């Protein structure tokens, strides 16, 4: 099978997704739009939503202009990253913003039509709402996969004509191999991440400022029901549902979807880049794209399985959505198995990694539903605490949220282990990281239908509000309530799914970051022209950057828990999560305060408004404006913090500090996000459980207590919690994009600060040794292929990239004591060795006894801490090369390269190991 043909699953699937998104949109627009009053209310919501979106995009556009200039400076002036990066950054943000706009336009047009359809039957209401949500789902996957496909074809074409571009002004845009292509493509994920964070934070602040203001004054103080047209904040509340849960959720999952595919492609290019599996490199890159393409086909089939019957219960409705999702998941799993078998022959176990991702997504969704739906015990217990007041409701909800972290965290942990293990990670770390990435792709492959269930929620919620404000008959309201209740559960499930996918994607990005370090070091070496910059120094030997393994980089940058730079990074990452949450929650509080004051003012100053007298009309626009202004102003600081902190940590603490930052942010952010989303969901549904008639029903003291809990939970589940998904991914994306800046300038910054990191000391001492002639570096294009290929692929040495072990007396050498290698001594000694048997004694390979004599020489050079001659163990391996040296007669023939032969024959006999 021609692998390039299988790539076309991606662009064809993308075009098909966009085609069906247009079909579903057209079908929705052709349906009955409802009464004149219903259309009027929907018009208010649509106008407010679009007004907010355009104002947000203006602010985001200004940020993108500044960021573009910054990346252009890094690319064209400092030359620390690819010139393609600024352009890729813009396209990622543009497509993310476009998907949000199209999803919002669909959702705001669908609410009145869902209400009208629900007046006919429950099934028709479900169909209109769900297929309108499917527009968002398929727009996200279609635009995401189309963007990836276009970039892949462009960069492949540039690589194919690189020779003709070398002497032209376009030479700076030349790409040389698949590793460079995939790392360039990965950087457009930062554009998507940045847009997603602004959408999530801004949308979350908007919706919850309106929601909290409407609830505190409307329900708690005035005692009027939810979605009552007398409440001036009710339209802003409905606008917020679309801004936060349609545009925000869509941008969030667009980022995860693209990030997982691109990170996996980059990891595949690395894992299959050299060694015996190098012929599968292209296959490994294209596999995540092909799986995502067939996932679109499967999602389209699943959409047509979502239908229900009249008098359906909540579980029946959940079952109908679950049926569609499960059909899509099964079809995707089968197709992924076939693709893996075809594209990765001999590596079918990678299919197990895909299944690990798929299954973990289902388990996380189920766990979220269990802890947040009112049909289950945890949320009912929260509602039961309302009999003793709001304080115990808040305590119970917090406890429920904390308890709910168990299953998702364990599930993701097990999924990571299985995905890593199935791909062969315990024998080969690069393959294991590829398995984690492909697991994230498996979880997100059915995003078309899973995002449809998420976007369905706010559409159904708006339809219920529309029916309430239009005073439609109780039967219609009953149906819209059923759809709304289903939407609350799917929204909570979707948040859990988004958090789980964010965790797996961030894990894959951690691995991809190391590949960006490699590319950054290569670019730095090409810019400086210094031979020494083409090596990193790992355990007694220089290793060419292009052949270095994951473990080589971790050792070179001293990434271990005893390194204070790593520990400080971990603490900063954990702290950043809580500071970010605090900033977003305080932002909601400030904006909600303004909203409460405005609603109170209108109740006092507009005659007859609170009593519902004819002619008394609330000023909805002023409340929308307050939420909009509050969201625009408050979203900037936390968003910029998430972008600036990784850049500063990279410069001041280096790659080891960045790894700590990302690990701390991921572990803390994932757990806190689950806790906040599920605590907020349980408070919300506890209130709805009481409103259904339990514990006194609406208007009772228990109801008021649960309203307080729901109000506290609003920023938990719709602002801070969901924004953490993007925070942990955006930090990784920023680190990936500025990796070139980090590797080029962090050693200098740290040296000025007096940190003198290990990698800087290694390179400085090696540089001195090269200049004074005591160290001769090997050819970086060929040296190290054996050891590094073995480190990447060989079962005998899967991680280390070196056969050498560190003796106790050499531990100090690893900390920068010395860096010399035997090769330096062997090459000058090669000429006298064959002359006569007598002078051969000083040569290290001649006999064990005289070998100790020249040992002080490298130490005097200042670059000798890695000398093998100084080791007591050195004479033992020296005996093996002595056998060929014992025949002096033929020694004249191979005279020009005795040292090279010795180094290759016995890695342990010299400082270069396999080199």
Predicted regions, residues:
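Hydrophobic packing and interface segments
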Residues: 1-787
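Long, low-complexity intrinsically disordered repeat regions
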Residues: 774, 779-915
